[in-house]
């Protein structure tokens, strides 16, 4: 059972309000996740993350930025015309200070997670605190904000750089002020983000209409080698729908468990064939092709790959994908990899993997491998974490 309660804290004389999510009383300190919402949204946007991870033993907090979002009982103080990324950094720092006063919080294990502007703010805050933050998860972070100021288009609006107004209305109805422009117009976001030396997970939509994908590639490149896991969601926009979100959560969970994304396979469906059908059973085969182009292995799926999907009665379809890849490993050795990926009793996809590559066998040896399936039009990306 997940408990939810409203909390409030202060930044100076401004009240910050939000919610705390936990799985109930615990006699041990819980790792902390603080979730920051995007521009023009509010803390309810982050509740799916908080509920999922509180069920898995985290103490989760979502909150409303001062002047940055929220309505009703959860609205924080402040005007939107006084808000910018630096005031939001101060908001997040105030929430972190609040967490330090909670007896059940393991303040040596804090994860900052944020979406869009909240993701950018989380990254900048992690850079300030560095070793005090264990993990940073940025989802479609709005790293474009400084460039948008330099182009006169903050918040999706258009304004004259030679005659900047004191305030303007954005397409989403939010009114922001000139001080936001002045605060970020000279910022190099990559220099700031690179100051953080902890673990980073960066998730981006390939077709994000708000934050061009190139910003996320450059952000990934600004971190040290091996520091950042970068997930590109094929056909993804600025945020993700219900068909993708469950596996985004598995990606994040695997990252927080210390797993590495050891391989991603892009799968494209070629045909569907009915294998068997009775009154209480239906079995189909989804045939597919595809490829993997990661650092540890590059290759293609061989012909004959099939996902056998079986439905008993009114239950859900159970999936069992069986396929072989042929290519080269990181040591440039030709090899094959055989994968059988099916859903375990705990609901996770737990593939078995075999290979004639010594490098690949050592890579997966002794690891609890979990697969996340991110569907897109015509196929899916299978991420293997271990």
Model-derived regions: residue spans:
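Catalytic histidine-centered segment of alpha/beta-hydrolase-like enzymes
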Residues: 236-247
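Beta-strand-enriched cores of mature, soluble protein domains
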Residues: 261-386
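N-terminal cap/lid segment of alpha/beta-hydrolase-fold proteins
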Residues: 1-25
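The serine-hydrolase catalytic nucleophile loop
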Residues: 39-51
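Short beta-strand/loop motif that positions the catalytic acidic residue
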Residues: 196, 202-204, 208
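Conserved alpha/beta-hydrolase
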Residues: 50-75
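Alpha/beta-hydrolase active-site loop
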Residues: 45, 81-102
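Hydrolase active-site cap/lid region
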Residues: 128-175
């Amino acid at each position: 059972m997940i408990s939810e309660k409203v909390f409030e804290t202060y930044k100076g004389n401004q009240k910050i309000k939000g919610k705390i999510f936990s799985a109930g009383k615990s006699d041990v300190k819980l790792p902390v996740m603080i979730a920051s919402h995007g521009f023009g949204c509010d803390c309810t946007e982050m509740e799916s993350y908080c509920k999922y991870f509180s069920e898995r033993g985290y103490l989760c907090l979502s909150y409303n930025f001062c002047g940055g979002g929220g309505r009703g009982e959860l609205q924080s103080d402040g005007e939107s015309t006084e808000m910018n990324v630096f005031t939001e950094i101060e908001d997040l720092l105030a929430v972190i200070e609040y967490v330090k006063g909670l007896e059940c919080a393991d303040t040596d294990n804090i994860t900052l997670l944020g979406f869009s502007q909240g993701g950018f703010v989380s990254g900048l805050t992690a850079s300030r605190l560095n070793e005090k933050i264990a993990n940073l998860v940025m989802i479609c972070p709005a790293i474009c904000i400084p460039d948008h100021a330099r182009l006169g288009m903050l918040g999706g609006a258009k304004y004259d750089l030679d005659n900047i107004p004191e305030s303007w209305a954005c397409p989403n109805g939010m009114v922001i002020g000139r001080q936001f422009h002045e605060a970020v117009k000279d910022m190099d976001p990559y220099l700031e983000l690179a100051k953080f030396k902890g673990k980073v997970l960066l998730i981006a939509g390939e077709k994000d209409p708000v934050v061009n994908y190139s910003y996320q590639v450059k952000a990934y490149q600004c971190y040290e080698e091996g520091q950042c896991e970068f997930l590109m969601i094929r056909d993804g926009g600025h945020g993700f729908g219900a068909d993708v979100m469950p596996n985004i959560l598995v990606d994040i969970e695997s990252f927080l468990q210390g797993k590495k994304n050891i391989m991603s396979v892009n799968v494209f469906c070629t045909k569907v064939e009915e294998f068997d059908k009775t009154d209480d059973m239906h079995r189909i085969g989804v045939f597919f092709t595809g490829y993997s182009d990661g650092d540890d292995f590059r290759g293609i799926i061989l012909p004959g790959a099939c996902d056998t999907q079986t439905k008993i009665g009114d239950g859900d379809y159970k999936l069992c994908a069986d396929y072989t890849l042929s290519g080269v490993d990181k040591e440039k050795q030709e090899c094959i990899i055989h994968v059988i990926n099916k859903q375990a009793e705990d609901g996770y996809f737990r593939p078995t993997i075999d290979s004639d590559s010594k490098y690949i066998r050592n890579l997966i040896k002794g690891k609890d491998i979990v697969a996340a399936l991110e569907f897109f039009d015509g196929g899916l990306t299978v991420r293997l974490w271990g």
